Amino acid sequence: MLKSGLMDTDDQKVGVRVANIDMSERTDNVHLIEIRRIISLVGAAYFFFMTAWVVPVACVITVSLLFPLMLFSTPLFNYLEHKLCAMVNAHWNAVSVFVGATVTEYGTNLAGYAEEKCLLLANHLGLLDHFVLMQSLNGKGSIRSRWMWVIYNIWKYTPLGVMWTSHGNFFVNGGVSKRDSVLSSFRDHLKNSFYKYDYGWVIMYPEGSRLYLVKNSGRTFAEKNGLKPLDNCVYPRTGAAHAVLDVLGPTDDSLSMSKCGKGEPIKYIIDATIGYRKGAVPDICDVMMGDWESVEASQFAVHYDVIPVKPEWSDENLLKEFLYERYIIKDKLLAEFYKTGHFPGDKTKVIPNNYEMMFAQVFWGCLYYAHYVYWLRPLIVHSWTSFLSIF
């Protein structure tokens, strides 16, 4: 009886102690999660404000102040504007690193093509695609300073859109009815801007929109045209890519002059295949809060193939045939990636430059503050005073 009673008492004491320890650990874990949540919320608010307002406003005002330089030296203007563009990309990389995203590259090493004239065509899965490409290409020569993006015009009238316009990026409208007029404007833009402002790469998503928005219509298009339906991407729209090669493509196999006659032609097509683990594209709002479904979900990948441009691709039918073949290959690459977790070939993990990203935050913060003190605040005060004087 005594032994039994002692054992019961000890068990109860041990049970109480274990329960207390478990409850203490649970409380500590809850506090830790709450602290991390607060840090994520503060960080997300900071980077959203910087990305959506501070950087665009500071960049646009600075570029506007630089415009008079073009009366004296266009190369000097281009040099300074390209430096600003590089710092914009450094900030975007800081956002990627903050949320915990990593990028691994497969296929051809693009370092040797950084200073060439190239057309990069990427599949479009989600809003994070921009971060994947920006982080991947950031450390490769002057690409990040001298690229021209072709972007859907939903962003055009936002501060980001104004900033991208000031750099010379081109916005496209959807719809068949506007196709000819948009492509005509794009051709004019390429002729007037590409060489004048010393661009190097043109980057676009030829599928037209994010995959989940065009997957059904893409399958219908394939079936209607007797093509094999693709599962992981859709056949590209060739209009914009053809416009690039029709204006900037080579006149002959010597690759010495572009078709518009203004300089060195586009020599390479960069076929970029972006992949997310198991095909699940993370939501950008969840990502900003650090809410990843798994550790692997934050590990992005991109596969590069480099194809020399052929002069005959200025014929849209021949270009279409080539691009359709490439997207069949792309579909197979993505199928393998979703199955195995990696693309074929050697891989290289992109290492971000932490010092540059920290400097970018200081740079844009100080630049915005200077513009606010000397331009924005007086303008706001004057506008408000003028408005009140009406009444």
Curated annotation (Swiss-Prot):
Disulfide bonds: none annotated. GO terms for biological process: CDP-diacylglycerol biosynthetic process; IRE1-mediated unfolded protein response; PERK-mediated unfolded protein response; phosphatidylinositol acyl-chain remodeling. Its EC number is 2.3.1.51. Pathway: Phospholipid metabolism; CDP-diacylglycerol biosynthesis; CDP-diacylglycerol from sn-glycerol 3-phosphate: step 2/3. The keyword Metal-binding does not apply. Pfam families: Acyltransf_C (PF16076). GO terms for cellular component: endomembrane system; endoplasmic reticulum; membrane. A motif (HXXXXD motif) lies at residues 124-129. Keywords: Acyltransferase, Lipid biosynthesis, Lipid metabolism, Membrane, Phospholipid biosynthesis, Phospholipid metabolism, Transferase, Transmembrane, Transmembrane helix. Belongs to the 1-acyl-sn-glycerol-3-phosphate acyltransferase family. This is Putative 1-acyl-sn-glycerol-3-phosphate acyltransferase acl-12. It comes from Caenorhabditis elegans.
